Swiss-Prot record:
Keywords: Cytoplasm, GTP-binding, Hydrolase, Metal-binding, Nucleotide-binding, Ribosome biogenesis, RNA-binding, rRNA-binding, Zinc. PANTHER family: SMALL RIBOSOMAL SUBUNIT BIOGENESIS GTPASE RSGA, SMALL RIBOSOMAL SUBUNIT BIOGENESIS GTPASE RSGA 1, MITOCHONDRIAL-RELATED. Monomer. Associates with 30S ribosomal subunit, binds 16S rRNA. GO terms for molecular function: GTP binding; GTPase activity; metal ion binding; rRNA binding. It comes from Mycoplasmopsis pulmonis (strain UAB CTIP) (Mycoplasma pulmonis). InterPro entries: G_CP_dom, NA-bd_OB-fold, P-loop_NTPase, Ribosome_biogen_GTPase_RsgA, RsgA_GTPase_dom, RsgA_N. One of its GO terms (biological process) is ribosomal small subunit biogenesis. It is an enzyme of class 3 (hydrolase). It is found in: Cytoplasm. This is Small ribosomal subunit biogenesis GTPase RsgA.
């Protein structure tokens, strides 16, 4: 049988196949080869999980595969907004050529942050606890897609899940389906929603980039596009001369914001 992994817990894999769930272990050969199935994987199984089908993409943290879009949930306050953290998320996700959606939460608590660049460049939404309508427009982004929610602890992922489930009469309360109450989720788990799937992930206080400087230089979609006009194929957009680096030229002309370029340089230093 072929099914999709919905949850991994204590060495067991919860697999959905033809509207039924099965809990199995992986065969020893997979473990010996250090091939670890993750949530979102399509797998072959009978009494045991025997094979992982080829993946179209994979994220390391959160560890998920075969997703259609990553929804970055980031707070404008409590925790304080950080363009550096957002750009770190974006570099990791866009490097995998995964579509990005950004949901800015707690917009009512902070109206001072300049997020215009992100609103203009990415599919983005602003939500406020005191504005129910700000959540209603989120329903359609999940339709017929496998979506993964990523973000720090405390940014409001649970609120979003509860709000969209209340706005969609086809589903039960999502947080109940995910086993979420007052406490944050501790495992990566997929559920069916709006003719697609949502993967909820644990929040975290820090995230590391696991790529080379060369990969990072092309990780942002815009950098990947514009770096093709740099003089050198492996331009890092750092110490090269202005006339040789198209990214630097676009920063100078303000087409790429200076704060984003500085975030990139900081990320570049992190992956040395």
């Amino acid at each position: 049988m072929i099914g999709r992994v919905y949850q991994v817990i204590s060495g067991f894999y919860d697999i959905k196949c033809e509207d039924k769930f099965y809990r199995v272990r992986a065969i020893g050969n997979l473990r010996n080869l250090k091939l670890n199935p993750v949530v979102g994987d399509l797998v072959v199984f009978d009494e045991s999980l025997t094979k992982i089908e080829p993946r179209k993409n994979i994220l390391i943290r959160p560890k998920v595969a075969n997703i259609d879009q990553a929804i970055i949930v980031i707070s404008l306050d409590q925790p304080k907004f950080s363009s550096f953290l957002l750009d770190k998320f974006l570099s990791i996700i866009e490097f995998q050529k995964i579509k990005v959606v950004i949901i800015f939460t707690k917009a009512d608590l902070n109206t001072k942050e300049d997020i215009g660049y992100y609103l203009k460049t990415y599919q983005s939404y602003l939500t406020s606890l005191d504005d129910e309508n700000s959540y209603k427009k989120l329903n359609d982004i999940f339709e017929k897609k496998i979506s993964v929610l990523v973000g720090q602890s405390g940014v409001g992922k649970t609120t979003i899940l509860n709000k969209v489930s209340l706005n969609n009469f086809f589903t039960q309360n999502i947080s109940k389906a995910l086993g979420r109450g007052k406490h944050s989720t501790r495992v990566v788990k997929m559920i069916d929603f709006n003719n697609g799937q949502i993967i909820d992930t644990p929040g975290f206080s820090s995230i590391e980039i696991q790529m080379s400087q060369k990969d990072l230089s092309k990780s942002f979609e815009s950098f990947d596009k514009y770096s093709q006009r740099c003089k050198y194929r492996h331009c890092l957009h750092q110490n090269e001369r202005l006339e040789d680096c198209n990214i630097k030229q676009l920063v100078q002309s303000q087409e790429i914001p200076l704060f984003r370029y500085n975030n990139y340089l900081k990320l570049l230093d992190e992956v040395k």
